[in-house]
Amino acid sequence: MSQIETKEFQTEIRQLLDIVINSLYTDREIFLRELISNAADASEKVRYMQLSGQNVKDQELPLEIRITPDENAKTLTIADAGIGMTKEDLIENIGTIAHSGSKAFVQRLAEAGDKKDVNLIGQFGVGFYSAFMVADKVSLTSRSYEPDAQGYRWESDGRGSYSISEEMDLPRGTSITLHLKEDAHSFAQADTVKRIIKQYSSFVPYPVYVGEEKINTVQALWTKNKNEISEEEYKEFYKYIANAYDEPLMRMHFSSDAPINLNALLFVPKSNMEKFGFGRMEAGVNLYCKKVLIQEKAKDIVPEWLRFARGVVDSEELPLNISRETMQDSALIAKLNKVVTSRFLKFLDDQAKNEPEIFKEFWNEFSIFLKEGAANDFTHRQEILKLLRFESSKTGEGELISLGDYVGRMKEGQEAIYFINGPTRQIIEEGPYLEVFKNKDYEVIYTYDGIDDYVFDMIREYDGKRLLSADHGDLNLADEDGASAEEKLLSEEELKEFNDWLKEVLGEKVTEVRESKRLVDSPAIILSHYGTHSMQRMMQLMNRDLQDVPAGILEINPKHVLIQRLNDLRKQEDSFAPLAAEQLFANAQIAAGIIVDPRSMVSRLNEILEKALR
């Protein structure tokens, strides 16, 4: 029987183990990720040695990781055929923290207090000790790759010392057996172990078995050359990573060495689940380092508006166990975010040019996310604006143009980009706001979503051209001379008297009544001082107050026969005139899309009918 040596842990190790053993971690199952990652690293080192022609013990051993849960013994064993360790390696790698940052690491872990994050343990290359979160004893056997190396057994309860003894007839590699704590017996159950492996270690580059079942059956496609991957493989990978049953609409697969080393494989689903009332989508991009999961549904790796994307970002430059706190403040994460987002936006721009029908399908499903990004993402705003698409007065129904298309065909002398919001194309085109634009042959963008006006208000201009709503009061679109005296049915004096009377009748509902130089066929129009009418509608609905309508400008068309007839009634001091004036204003509100209280209008219409039918 070989002699058993007992050694004391280095001071920093004792401090580390004390913190690990006596702390409660909410995500302690991460220990298995650490041990599998160590096994994969050990296997990679042996593979490199074999490729470089070095003499390696047990050349025929397959490079695989075998995990054996034993519910009866309450143990969990992780075994690899990797590089293994000599006696010196065991003392150096496990008995001490063999680098200058050890004291700083232990100090940081101690200072974390109640907010300790298990991820900190792996940041300094000491992930092995996470085993003591779930085990009250760890037994390790190991044999180095060196042909004449002796095998050794290492054991510890994590209380301050460890033992080393020789072990005969060991294969190359390392086997770690965890004798599980009473509150950690679930880790001896095969189903629990399989779930953890699938969550954290699905893509390690070596087979991982639980019993005889291979768990990591899906390849890490993002690390492969895209020319070597079939369409079917991409589809199956998407279904796995997105937990989806359908096929993706689009995918982007790219690798980059500068400004940061990364591999990314992102998919766009076919459906926007937020549209169906399933609530706000969670982030869908997982962050990996060397095929090992760092964070599932990483919120910081892409902007909030890109939450519809599904896939993987993998960077070897990340610390394997970057903590959640560090994620939020890391300059490296910020750089990853910027690179991935810019590449994805370029990908969408390429799709718009090369696959317009697919991009149109994407736009119909996910336009709301790009609009959210245009309003809130200052870093990528200009890239996003190129992707926005709208119908217009110069397109057919369902035909979309970009802001760039609009600017490219602006009329000579046109100073701004004009847009109008309404529930449907028909309602917009039947309203009075397009009349002056039709006369001038100016194109007007049609927007149908409430967020559109908010987006345009936030971005304010595109390509040096202001974005102006067609219902704004200060557009300066009319010809200088306006309507000729012959065309007007009212003299200048009568017009002033009529406007003053109308202002008096309507009171605080309007700030001003004036002659319109933009109307052709309609008798009156309401223009907005602030914001747009669609934003006013939103405020009315949010406040649940149909009376909460900001006073606007009422413009009248002195060429219209209705205005002439109303003026005649005014001059006759007919009691019908104020009722008609109120209804004229209500009609203009309805044309503007402003929600009118129907009860007051019905009462007024009944009175109008009563007088008309006498």
Swiss-Prot record:
InterPro entries: HATPase_C_sf (IPR036890), Heat_shock_protein_90_CS (IPR019805), HSP90_C (IPR037196), Hsp90_fam (IPR001404), Hsp90_N (IPR020575), Ribosomal_Su5_D2-typ_SF (IPR020568)
Intracellular or extracellular location(s): Cytoplasm
Domain of life of the organism encoding this protein: Bacteria
GO MF term set: ATP binding; ATP hydrolysis activity; ATP-dependent protein folding chaperone; unfolded protein binding
Region annotation (C) ranges: 538-614
The keyword Protein transport appears for this protein: no
Chief location of this protein within or outside the cell: cytoplasm
Region (B): 325-537
Keywords: ATP-binding, Chaperone, Cytoplasm, Nucleotide-binding, Stress response
Pfam families cross-referenced by the UniProt entry: HATPase_c_3 (PF13589), HSP90 (PF00183)
Region (A), start-end ranges: 1-324
Cellular component, GO annotation: cytoplasm
Family stated for the protein in its record: Belongs to the heat shock protein 90 family.
Complex and partners: Homodimer.
Record's function text: Molecular chaperone. Has ATPase activity.
The name this protein goes by in its record: Chaperone protein HtpG
Source taxonomy: Bacteria, Bacillati, Bacillota, Clostridia, Eubacteriales
Gene for this chain: htpG
